[in-house]
UniProtKB/Swiss-Prot annotation:
Subcellular location(s) per record: Cytoplasm
Catalytic activity: 3'-dephospho-CoA + ATP = ADP + CoA + H(+)
Superkingdom of source: Bacteria
One example GO MF annotation: dephospho-CoA kinase activity
Gene behind the chain: coaE
Family annotation (CDD domains): DPCK
Provenance organism: Syntrophus aciditrophicus (strain SB)
Name by which UniProt lists this protein: Dephospho-CoA kinase
Function noted in UniProt: Catalyzes the phosphorylation of the 3'-hydroxyl group of dephosphocoenzyme A to form coenzyme A.
Record's signal peptide: none
Length: 235
């Protein structure tokens, strides 16, 4: 376990990494899990927060990509920035180098805040680049939201108004959804009607509750064993 990671394995909290690829419906699944009782940490929202005007990540973006990526109110124009970086993998990597350290620190703080309120919480982190960045070991469960690549493209065209070429470029700029399957503990097929996805989430939530209870029981047992060992040493 990497040092400094606020992972559920340290206690009863269950840390779930929710991932997928562009237009797969991670936010929809996150809302369903929130409705069941999960605490949600949205990495896109964290990125927005750390990119607020005059914060270090904001300054790094402006220094690297120029003032043209700013709106009149000095906030980042994410659509314009996205057009720049998704057309050039090196620029995308540079953006990630600027933003990710601040986002990960904000995530750690969020997890610890939840732990302080609900030590037995099920925390779901909506993290698009979880697998690409090799963060699997930060989580107790990896939950992958899946739709076929052609459905990704279709949804991008309908939802975002992209041309077919733009949609294909966005999909190809990321790790293939098919390549992510082997990294997942649980897969949600989100290609069908919403009701089918909800039915899957209902079953998955039962699994997560069971895992959290087992983890809590294991943590309590470990604590008791440690206490006994200490008492023997004192004696």
């Amino acid at each position: 376990m990497p040092e400094g990671v606020p992972c559920g394995r340290r206690g009863a909290m269950l840390n779930v990494g929710l991932t997928g690829s562009i237009s797969c419906g991670k936010s929809t699944v996150a809302r369903m899990l929130e409705g069941k009782g999960a605490f949600i940490i949205d990495f896109d929202r964290l990125a927005h927060d750390v990119e607020e005007p005059d914060k270090p990540a904001w300054r790094g973006i402006v220094d690297t990509f120029g003032p043209d990526v700013l709106r009149e109110d000095r906030t980042i124009d994410r659509a314009r920035l996205g057009t720049l970086v998704f057309a050039d993998r090196r620029k995308l990597e540079k953006l990630n180098e600027i933003v990710h350290p601040a986002v990960f620190e904000a995530w750690r703080r969020s997890v610890e805040e939840i732990r302080g309120v609900r030590p037995d919480a099920i925390v779901v982190s909506d993290f698009p680049l979880l697998i690409e960045l090799g963060k699997q070991n930060d989580y107790d469960v990896i939950l992958l939201v899946y739709i076929p690549p052609q459905e990704q493209i279709r949804r991008l065209i309908l939802r975002n108004g992209y041309s077919p070429e733009e949609a294909i470029q966005r999909v190809n700029s990321q790790m293939s959804i098919e390549d992510k399957i082997d990294f997942a503990d649980i897969i949600v097929n989100n290609a069908g009607p919403r009701e089918q996805t909800q039915a899957q989430i209902d079953k998955i939530w039962t699994q997560l509750l069971k895992k959290e209870r087992l983890q809590r029981k294991s943590a309590a047992s470990s604590f008791q064993t440690g206490t006994i060992h200490k008492e023997r040493e004192v004696g």
